[in-house]
Structure formats: C-alpha cells, structure tokens
Amino acid sequence: TFGVHATSGMLVYTRREEKRSSEDTLQKSLPRRNQGLAGRFTYAYDSRCFAEFNFGYNGSERFAAHERYGFFPSFGLGYIISNESFWEPLLNTMDKLKFKMTYGLVGNDAIGSSDDRFYYLSEVNPNDGGRGQYFGTNYGNQMNGVSISRYPNTNITWEKSKKGNFGIELGMFNSALEVQADFFYERRTQIYQNRAYIPSTMGLSAG
C-alpha cells in the first residue's frame, strides 16, 4: 500500500500425482498426474476503483504434448461510486452503490469417461478371440486376432468456457436494505462428444 493505492500479488505452483489401488485395467492403474501455475494480481485506488487479474497455466496428462497445456486468464473491475465525495449527500438514503464485472476463460480436462485417460493413444487388443482366424482340418484351429477399440486423436484438448458477469450492489438506509443483482454469461466450446454413428465409408471398422 502506498498513499491511496493498494496492490497485491500471488503465484502458486501445484503438482499432483494420484495412485489408486485395486484398479482392473493397466490404464487405470497408472499414476494420474497434472501440474499448473496460477497467479492473482489486484489493484485498488482510494477504496473506490478496483481491478483484478487472474490466470491459470495448467497441464493435463489426458492430451497430446502439443495440446497438453492451456492458458486461462480472467479479469475483474469494480467501482464503488458511493465512496465518491459527490455522493455524500445521498449516504443517508443509499449508503452503498457498487458496479462490478468479470470476464474470463476456464478450462476443463474432466471430459469423457474417466476410463479414457489418454486420448492421443490407440486402444488395441492384440489377442481378441472375436477377431481371430480359423484354419486346419474342419477349421479346428484358431488364432486370435487384433482389434482396435479406439483410434488416437491428438487434436483433443481442453474444453473451454468463456464466462462473464455484470452485477450491482445496493445498500440503503444504513444497510437496513441490501440488494444484489447479477447477470451471468457462459459459452462453451471444444466440447468432447462420442459419435453415435460412424459411416463404414470412413474405413475405421470391419466386421
């Protein structure tokens, strides 16, 4: 704090590894890992004007290397007009009037099934009896085949959400009556979905 100015800042680095016991597949038994860097910076002027900037730079194991990290910033502004000197004649009636707004980008890597951890890798069964071959006398011998239950997609990345908020806070009659109204906005993009049908002309399956 210096004079009528006040600032603050914070950086946080996190790294997490989670291991689960008694999993029924190799994929589930592998450690789950992610890491991220988050920051928060604020500024206030004379208890009237406020600004805040936040960011997250996060990495997820679920995506290919070139899509693994995402940058998600946000900012907010506030203005307490009732702290202005010209508002003093109105303080007995309306002792607080504040306008505020925020806007930011949020990332989500908890998409699809928790069993599908590595979207950039194929899921292959090299010993599938249902895809085998029969040969020999009266076709009495069988050799198991190979099946692919999922093809790799290196373009799958963070689900993103743009979020905004505009609000107003009122305090009247020495805060005997308080009113708060907010308008929220959200728009999601890059939503992961499983296709219900894939045409055979794509050549991804054979029966």
Model-derived features with residue positions:
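Extracellular/periplasmic, surface-exposed regions of secreted and cell-surface proteins
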Residues: 1-207
